[in-house]
Amino acid sequence: KFFQRHIMKRRRSPAADAATPSASSDPMFKTLEFARSLRTIRDYFNLIDKCGEGAFSAVFRARPLTGGDRCLAVKVISQCCDLQRTCTEILLLKALKGSPNVISLVSAVREAETVLLVMDYVEHRPFVEFYRQLQPDQVQHYMRCLLDALSRVHSMGVVHRDVKPSNALYNPATGQFALADFGLAHLVQQQPQRPRPAARPAAVGSAAVFPSNKSAAASCRCASGLVCGPCLSKRPIRAPRGGTNGYRPPEVLLQADSQDCRVDTWAAGCILAAFLSGRQPFLWCRSDTECLYLLCCLFGLNSMRSAAAAVGRELRVLPVASETLPEAEFPCRRDRLSSVCRLIRGTEAGSSDGPSSSVFDLLSGLLQADPAKRLTAADALKH
């Protein structure tokens, strides 16, 4: 009842606000000490330990002071985080409450410069501790739970935007699963996409764009001499870029306008690839450019150019880089993914110990560079 009366905002005296530490200015914001100093937590919870953290939040395992065996997760969000994003997260969790395989929100409270989200705690293990040891039927169960959660989220017109192993809580011993952290989630835009004008390459020679080492040494100022004037004069592209390196699909890397729920199914495919290859993350990269290069190596330069054109973008490659990339699209995407995963894992082709070909059919459908050809979560569940 306390939480129902104090959803998001409540009136407090200036003296009470002054007595509460500031999350935005305290460098110890993510510590147990700071969380225990909050009045709501002091009065109603016994914090046990910290079980996770993000850029603007920390999650603590807790039990209610009223007793009982119920274990809760208390997410402490700093007001450094966009308040609108926090409101969206609360509204989405409230709408999804009761959905299987999705974290359940108990309540939310605002105290001074922090917002507390109280959720059911899901006993789980870090992904890196079990993803190499799971049996095929356990991997199937994990992926079915993940795709089921995404299907339910997507059916409400919501895209998660940050699907990754640390946000997919899983207990291998019990099979319990919960999709968590909706901090980047938002509603899919329903307005029709405006046609984009055809890309027009700058009418400059390669010598002007890529000067020789001799001329570059004399003219370059912090590498600006390597970029042509037309490129510098273009307006910066504004498009959603939420997510984590290694799990962003090509349309996000290319900052395309058209992004929908299949952003999440690409990330689910990256998780499945980690299971099949034994490498986490499957696409290890430090930047969007590096990730695009890896995708060109994996699928072929022509395939990625076609995918870029499908979302209204043009993919250009430096001449020195194009020499090391496979030009043609591989004839069978499934076989290409299978050979790469087996090579990384050290499994011989045709070995009975390796995954079945059907799972690579699913992986191929999830890791389609063109989002229009990519499987939705609902379609993947029928596989």
Regions found by a protein language model. Name each.
Residues 98-107:
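Conserved HxN/HPN-centered segment at the entrance to the catalytic loop
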Residues 58:
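Conserved N-lobe ATP-binding subsite of Hanks-type protein kinase domains
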